[in-house]
Amino acid sequence: MHLSLLTGAVGCAGTRAALQPSTPPATDAAPAAIVPPKDAHVHALVAADASGTQDYVCSPVTGHDGSFAWTLRGPDAVLFGAQGAQLGRHFAGPTWEWSDGSAIVGALAAKADAPDPADIPWLLLSVKEHKGAGGALAPVRFVQRLATKGGKAPADGCDGDHANQVARVPYSAHYVFLGS
């Protein structure tokens, strides 16, 4: 049986308002660990705020008989522009898909702890695949995840009795798309 569990103090309907990042930091304010290399010659092309969930599944731990842990299945979020218009969505891959049909798939390049230990880390992802012809995401080479709120795996509730259970943890973040 596949069960779903929504964790956190906010239900899905209120996630965007309650978890909206405060004034997102500028790209140059990102920790040095998640700034693209200077020889990449990239700059910020566009930014978006994400609001949704980080989804985890309760899975057996390989090599540890009887142990279970929350494993990231992926994000499920809507991307919004500065004026609140929906720009696209963000889902497992990790993939960002724009409303114009362009999409990118990222790979972890670097990470830094969020200022609040209760929040998921800030990331630098390199683009490993472009999908769709042209579009807003076509020139993107890196993505920064900044100003995260929430999204961490539950601290407990994952054991043999809860195998395959899904925890949908509310989160928000500010994504900066970098290219040339």
Which residue ranges define each predicted feature?
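Bacterial N-terminal signal peptides
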Residues: 2-9
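Primary mode marks residue(s) on the alpha4-beta5-alpha5 output face of response regulator receiver
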Residues: 22-53, 62-180
